Regions:
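Charged, low-complexity intrinsically disordered regions
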Residues: 1-250
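Conserved pre-motif I regulatory segment
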Residues: 250-284
Length: 286
């Protein structure tokens, strides 16, 4: 294809031939300037804040690419860019419309071990639910390592055996509540093993089914207690709902359907894949 008449056709050819929005190539095809093309394809393609082509000109992508992925992060970037350059207001407007619907607390599934929940909340839950004595709170702490993706409860064995919450209500004589909480945070089912000697005098570990069943009941009780606790405080609920929506409910799939698009007059040798049709389907509506 040497020439085309419209910006939409140029975009179709660029996507088919180059698999991207190549404004220089589209300019050659149409004889239009890059600025003219950008104007005619407004809301069909978007200039990406902070990204330039190798020749220093603005970098553009199709709407279905730009308005998908982590659209919350993209909106923040566009808002910052628009403060410096008002032409990015169109990005802000489009991304605002593309934001996922905020979920409320009743729609958010919370579980122990979800890494978006700050360890301070886990520690607060632990102290309140297990009635951790104040003098022990310095030595019993919740830690999370992003390097190993492991939760650890430091000082989990420092609680005394006559602690009812730790060894009876939420724990057993074989696994206290802090140990079971640590397993729960690491998404492990609690297991209790006995060490026995076999016929050859060698020690080996065998699962104690009775103690494991009892500990599993305590583990379920801790999980239920956490679900009940996490939303109970209004301020905590508001903070965590906002954090969840910002961090976890932040993406939008590429979903624009351009399968119905045909390009009259375009070179029949050029074929577009379905996602490429989708990318320019919007331009057919303009």
């Amino acid at each position: 294809v040497a020439t085309v008449d419209t910006a939409s056709e140029a975009l179709a050819v660029s996507i088919s031939e180059k698999a991207c929005v190549d404004m220089g190539y589209m300019s050659q095809l149409t004889g239009k300037t890059k600025e003219e093309l950008a104007g005619e394809l407004q809301s069909v393609i978007f200039r990406v804040p902070g990204q330039l082509e190798q020749d220093g000109t603005p970098h553009y992508v199709t709407a279905d690419e730009y308005l998908s992925g982590n659209v919350r992060r993209k909106l923040r970037q566009a808002q910052r860019a628009a403060q410096q350059d008002p032409s990015f207001a169109v990005n802000v407007e489009a991304l605002t419309a593309a934001q996922p619907k905020d979920l409320d607390a009743s729609e958010i599934e919370v579980r122990l071990g979800a890494t978006w929940i700050d360890k301070e909340y886990i520690q607060q839950f632990m102290y309140e639910t297990f009635n951790t004595p104040f003098y022990l709170q310095r030595s019993i702490e919740v830690n999370y390592s992003s390097f190993t993706a492991e939760w650890q409860i430091k000082g989990k064995t420092s609680v005394s055996y006559n602690d009812v919450a730790a060894y009876t209500t939420y724990g057993t004589s074989r696994a206290n509540a802090y140990k079971i909480l640590e397993d729960s945070l690491n998404l492990r089912d609690v297991r209790i093993y006995d060490t026995i000697e076999d016929a050859d005098g060698k020690e080996r570990r065998v699962l104690n089914a009775k103690e494991t069943t009892l500990a599993a009941q305590k583990q379920q009780a801790i999980r239920e207690a956490f679900k009940d606790w996490i939303w109970r405080d209004p301020e905590r609920r508001q903070t965590l709902v906002r954090q969840y929506n910002e961090e976890m409910n932040s993406t939008r799939p590429r979903e624009y359907d351009g399968s119905h698009i045909t390009f009259g007059g375009m070179n029949p040798a050029i074929t577009l894949r379905e996602h490429q049709k989708s990318a320019i389907a919007r331009s057919e509506e303009h």
